[in-house]
Amino acid sequence: MLSLPLLLLLLWGMGSHSFPTVPSETREEDVEMVQKYLENYYNLKSDGEQIEKQRHRSPVVEKLKQMQEFFGLKVTGKPDAETLNVMKQPRCGVPDVAEFVLTEGNPRWENTHLTYRIENYTPDLPRADVDQAIEKAFQLWSNVSPLTFTKVSEGQADIMISFVRGDHRDNSPFDGPGGNLAHAFQPGPRIGGDAHFDEDETWTSNFRNYNLYRVAAHEFGHSLGLSHSTDIGALMYPNYFFTGDVQLSQDDINGIQAIYGPSQNPIQPIGPQTPEVCDSKLTFDAITTIRGEVMFFKDRFYMRINPYYPEAELNFISIFWPQLPNGLQAAYEVSHRDEVRFFKGNKYWAVKGQDVLYGYPKDIHRSFGFPSTVKNIDAAVSEEDTGKTYFFVADKYWRYDEYKRSMDAGYPKMIADDFPGIGDKVDAVFQKDGFFYFFHGTRQYKFDPKTKRILTLQKANSWFNCRKN
């Protein structure tokens, strides 16, 4: 009879070669992590009897596949590096598939006027900051539903909120810093609806780990009856990301309104939607190369491709650069400086790797010499061979010398004159293998700057290995 850790080690030996091998000195530690993760969030039974009964269809493999499918990973049933990376991310303690409820079916509050009480306060933040974070988190949900929330200072409330650590006598102990950040129980009597936050975490009111407002808003979704979402852009996605602007996605809004009905507001609120890489109508805000990869930006998200992995990675911009705003308008790489510059409005940021350089953001007029009539940059690209950077603004473009750090004389010029066939407006552009790739709406033009000719016309998302467009 195989023990669960041994079975996991055997699975590792059969692992995919698409990802880096797990170092042997950390393998045992990761095996234990995988076991605990699947037990905690995917209802894996660790008893040897179940494994023996399902010897030819291992429950470990099935649970790994279930987890990989939930997170949109390549479904292999093997604990590859990408799977381990997702498992190591901080997250909500509510399981993704197992029951974590006190009532059968789809629990909901019968009363839409709910009360909450903060039983104790974390010392990480001033009490006023905790009160504000909790109030704002509830307001997110009340804005899109008929629910109201009133704070009480004593007695039993519908939703009791506490900061605790370790084993706090609810059969769901916390695990220390990182990992399981908080959990909440779905509507019901006694502990139903209550939210617990791990006091071993450091709670903040900014982008540093962990933003209390962001985590509380997620947990209160559980308190109201919502389960986890597979939509990475949803607030109810299980893993923790801080995107700067905590908001409900359309997926979250649809979920809460399915339980309680629409908001009482005359105009129903609409939330952002997560881009789908194989959507034939997909457009981009900005695109740039970065150290051999290509990154496409849309709203709060980036989509990344590299030569070694065919699937596009979709994630939040804030994962790499929490200081950058959402809705970037232009970006380009300065390869000889190992920098990427991002633009929004009249400001730009320079980054090296995952670090935003000191002194940024800066003003585009002072740094590049744009006239005051230029309010923002639509697109930008830098030629690696010449050090010339092209800035596209409305139907004109400027050319900037990265070595001299000055605008070239004789600009701006008309886009249509020097880049015939691409139209007079550019949404995004990048250079690869000597060619420019211009994007406007759902179209992409491969352009040869030497011959000034369009070579191909394709869908904007043709880089994403989609079967149909």
From Swiss-Prot:
GO biological process: cellular response to UV-A; collagen catabolic process; extracellular matrix organization; proteolysis
Residues making up the propeptide: 19-99
Cysteines engaged in disulfide bonds, as pairs: C278-C466
Main location: secreted
Binding positions (Zn(2+) 1): H168, D170, H183, H196
Record PTM Phosphothreonine, positions in chain: T274
Cofactors named for this entry: Ca(2+); Zn(2+)
EC number: 3.4.24.7
Binding positions (Ca(2+) 2): D158, R190, G192, D194
Keywords, alphabetical: Calcium, Collagen degradation, Disulfide bond, Extracellular matrix, Hydrolase, Metal-binding, Metalloprotease, Phosphoprotein, Protease, Repeat, Secreted, Signal, Zinc, Zymogen
Motif (Cysteine switch): 90-97
Active site: E219
One annotated Gene Ontology cellular component of this protein: extracellular region
Positions that bind Ca(2+) 3: D175, G176, G178, N180, D198, E201
Regulation of catalytic or functional activity: Can be activated without removal of the activation peptide.
Record function comment: Cleaves collagens of types I, II, and III at one site in the helical domain. Also cleaves collagens of types VII and X.
Protein name, per record: Interstitial collagenase
Organism: Equus caballus (Horse)
